[in-house]
Amino acid sequence: YLTLMGMLRGENEYTYPPYNAKQATELITCLREMAPYVIIDCGSYIANDILSAIALMESDAVLRLVNCDLKSISYLSSQLPLLRDNKWDADKQYKIASNIKPNEASEHVEQVLGSVTFKLPYSAELAAQSLAGDLLADLSLRESRGFRKAIEAISREVFGC
């Protein structure tokens, strides 16, 4: 089974009252009791996002995805001093060069991150599904094979399946 939780169309971070670290911790604890695996898509601005900060601290594993474009690499460079703090436990972080397009060099990400654990290639099929709001559809095109294989490798490493 797959359960998704998120905001409805038209909602944003100001739709609901603010919450604190204790409430974020309680939410994650409750989710862990309900499901064997909990995946939280954290925001990139963790200094002001309590849920993302708590999720990063409480997690068993962190997948840190970074696109190979200049904007993503520059932003990550500015956040690395914060992410290297001991409270974020760098040993449980998997570094992933993500959405690698043929004309982009993942080596630039590796210069900033150090070695990456996985590389996720760009998939036009996935991009089309994202635009259509159909992210749960199968990726069936041949050009998506590299993406599927990378996701399988990540699943084996992180979830043991």
Predicted regions and their residues:
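P-loop NTP-binding core
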Residues: 1-18, 61, 68-71, 81-93, ...
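Inter-motif core of Ras-like GTPase G domains
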Residues: 30-33, 49-69
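Beta-strand-loop-alpha "switch" segments that mediate conformational coupling across diverse proteins
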Residues: 99-140
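P-loop/Walker-type NTP enzyme "switch/lid" segment
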Residues: 1-33, 128-131
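Loop/turn-to-beta-strand initiation segments
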Residues: 2-3, 33-40, 61
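Hydrophobic "anchor" residues on beta-strands that sit immediately upstream
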Residues: 37, 56, 94
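Short beta->alpha connector loops
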Residues: 43-47, 69, 99-102
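A short acidic, amphipathic alpha-helical/loop segment
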Residues: 50-55, 73, 78-79, 106-109
